[in-house]
Amino acid sequence: MTEKPTIAFAKFAAPKKGSVILLVPEGGNLGQAATAADPAGVMPKVFAAAEFKGKLAATVEALAPQGTAYDRVAVIGTGNPSALTEQSWLQIGGAAAAAAKNAGEVTVIADVAGLELSAREAANIGLGILLRSYVFDKYKTRRDENGIKARDKKFTIQCADPNAAKKAFAEASALGDGVYLARDLVNEPANVLGPVEFAAQAKALESLGVKVDVLTEREMKKLGMGALLGVAQGSVRPPRLVVMQWNGGKPKQKPVAFVGKGVVFDTGGISIKPAASMEDMKGDMAGAAAVVGLMHALAARKAKTNAVGIIGLVENMPDGNAQRPGDIVTSMSGQTIEIINTDAEGRLVLADALWYCKEQFKPQFMVNLATLTGAIIVALGNSHAGLFSNDDTLSERLTAAGQATGEKVWRMPLGSEYDKLIDTKNADMKNTGGRQAGSITAAQFLKRFVDDTPWAHLDVAGTAMGSPSSEINQSWASGFGVRLLDRLVADHYEG
């Protein structure tokens, strides 16, 4: 896993070395503990000179005031005190990490005038620091442009109750590790991370108590997974289906289930993609990466739930054995599918994975994640994932979790008028409905493989990779879905 900084918590005390970060509300002043770190009272003059107003995540930096033992100081705005949310504290932590890029020892004085920060808020500052500190540079031979290495950095967050904050951060850190893992998997080049290697990364979760089974091509053939195997047949790299189980709930409690599309590289197959930006298709397994990251987070924080994670891992290549347009395959469900476009392959992988999950585990619900369609980017851009669901309660809970974490979703329609667009004379269905409503017809296709199980499909093509940089992510891979689904579980399916 990518290196992380050390994050600790302590009581308020005068900083003795390194860099110091102070927090100031919009239009406000330094808090009592922060004021003690500025004995000469020079920071208000710095604010005035820099026209610093305390806007959320705004930053001003200066040399340490005379008479202090530390080297540099940065002040970060916390914005309007009445508008602060969980996301705000993550952003503040991210701004702190950015301000301390070239510092080894950093003290964050989590004291805001007029506010009493909770342990959870202090922990979220730490999580924001963790998320912003992620840098994927393992293949760079010269890494100095990224400042001091994360492993050599230590952030000490001073707060009112450091013991409670440390306890809260233990869970937050587990979540951060899950995001790091998902980002690592998506950022990894496809020549390094094939289906077998990806499965090995998931298998490593056994060290956390996750039960992991890896189904081979032969085992999938016995199960009748013709849809998934049809995608894989053009690659010399064999496919895998990985089944992860975390049993932290009651013995007879039905599990919650998460299914991820894991196309480790997508050329489009015989319906080959244009060359421009094809390198980004190493990230066409971001849905599977999020599921692995989520299972890591649930296990690491000892979530009191039973959860199943299933990922279908294939490579879509155009060799002489590759699937052709016009082919008809039989899915595990027994339903037949006419292949119209071999670049609509992710839904074929998910069709068998969803059916296997439904039949094998009878879960409370299934949520699948997939970088499924470019159409969802046209519809929603990069700020929301597309949400399609057959269950209003599940949809509402996902939407609320998205608002809380900042990993936002937007519900899209489903209906018979869209479903008929994937009908065909030659088989039970075809794998694409054409240009119109492309993300919706893809979801309608998946819906045919879930029966009455409560289900949601998250199309994360616009949010999982190549999204705009933010206060908590500067990486090409965002790890989208890990925090969203962890919150869904924590709020509704534990205990």
UniProtKB/Swiss-Prot annotation:
NCBIfam families on file: PRK00913.1-2, PRK00913.1-4, PRK00913.2-2, PRK00913.2-4, PRK00913.3-5
Cofactor or coenzyme needed: Mn(2+)
Gene Ontology terms for molecular function: manganese ion binding; metalloaminopeptidase activity
Catalytic reactions of this protein: Release of an N-terminal amino acid, Xaa-|-Yaa-, in which Xaa is preferably Leu, but may be other amino acids including Pro although not Arg or Lys, and Yaa may be Pro. Amino acid amides and methyl esters are also readily hydrolyzed, but rates on arylamides are exceedingly low; Release of an N-terminal amino acid, preferentially leucine, but not glutamic or aspartic acids
Any one annotated GO CC term: cytoplasm
Compartments, as annotated in UniProt: Cytoplasm
Similarity annotation: Belongs to the peptidase M17 family.
Keywords: Aminopeptidase, Cytoplasm, Hydrolase, Manganese, Metal-binding, Protease
UniProt protein name: Probable cytosol aminopeptidase
Pfam family, one: Peptidase_M17_N
Organism: Chelativorans sp. (strain BNC1)
